[in-house]
């Protein structure tokens, strides 16, 4: 098997039609010797900010001298990004070798595992093989029935900002969504919650109490955000002052506060994480595709906000960083998202839209999205490819700012097309 064949095997397994649950993952991992039983975890769930928070946690733990696994989704440029150890992606040859090990075990099961379940098994094998001290494990979807939830009680469970997303799978209210996320809370294992949504906070507090899990809600009253520039945003939190965070979204200091709170919980459990490591980890964290500046002048931003809750945070960042400016938006949205609310947020900042369809069956066709924008009084033109869309948006932008957003699924293609355009 070569690398391409390994990826084809992983992606060939579709999750549609599978009944959610942990049985398949448990069966698969048992057949592989239960590699996850050798590992310690920080388990991260949430609607938005979970990837950024996970990246910050991993960066700080690495700065403290630990060997750190990081499991995230989706990938931006390359599949291997999803499974990292100390910032290094799993090598192609290791991925192929582990797929060759997982495939016979998966093929022998009567209820075939899903793509995400297979990737979770690959991650656990790699983290065990590389002898990680701790793994920062990002939930795929929800919490309770997510395949990452097979782990024993983690060192800490972290629940980031919650909002309305995946309502078909998780339920129509914030309480339903919080209930799914709170499924990662394990008996006696500490929980850190971003908080701020009373309906959701009540569910998390109740679940933590039922499971005798000590709960810490992030105290955002102790967060002071200073002026940011296009390279970093500077903030103080709970005795850590003047931290320059290279993730420049206005919302990122709040994610950092969540990470700091969780790291201090770990410290109270005996992990050696000095404040100097927290500072160093935050100041060198990298997390592509989240309010990422690809060019300073004229500005070209790439952002992965893919639901109304995330879009609201991105729009606030645009208002903070570029007051009074109109944008050319390069936009792709998944057809199952709240398109109405996302467009309502973007239209006041938009000079012009260029619409494209990300390379996934879930993407709304570019022409349909353009029609929806025009129906609301916006100016929009569809592009037949992402490459054509990037070129057109840059041309329309002139010396003004351009922002590509609406889904993480086109981030890699946008980055590639933009690099090609600027060769």
What do the PLM-derived regions correspond to, one by one?
Residues 110, 118, 131-138, 154-239, ...:
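Acidic, Mg2+-coordinating active-site environments of NTP-dependent enzymes
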Residues 194-216, 230-234, 299-302, 308, ...:
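C-terminal helical cap/extension that packs against the catalytic core
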Residues 1-48, 52-67, 76-78, 93, ...:
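N-terminal leader/targeting and accessory segments in enzymes
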Residues 127-133, 269, 320-325, 393-401:
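Glycine-rich phosphate-binding loop signature in dinucleotide/nucleotide-binding domains
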Residues 18, 22, 26-37, 63-152, ...:
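ATP-dependent carboxylate-amine ligase catalytic core
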Residues 38, 134-137, 145-158, 162-163, ...:
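Nucleotide phosphate-binding/pyrophosphate-handling subdomain across enzymes
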Residues 407:
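Active-site-proximal loop/hinge segments that shape catalytic or ion-binding/gating pockets
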Residues 183-191, 321-327, 349-354, 398:
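Short, surface-exposed connector motifs at secondary-structure boundaries
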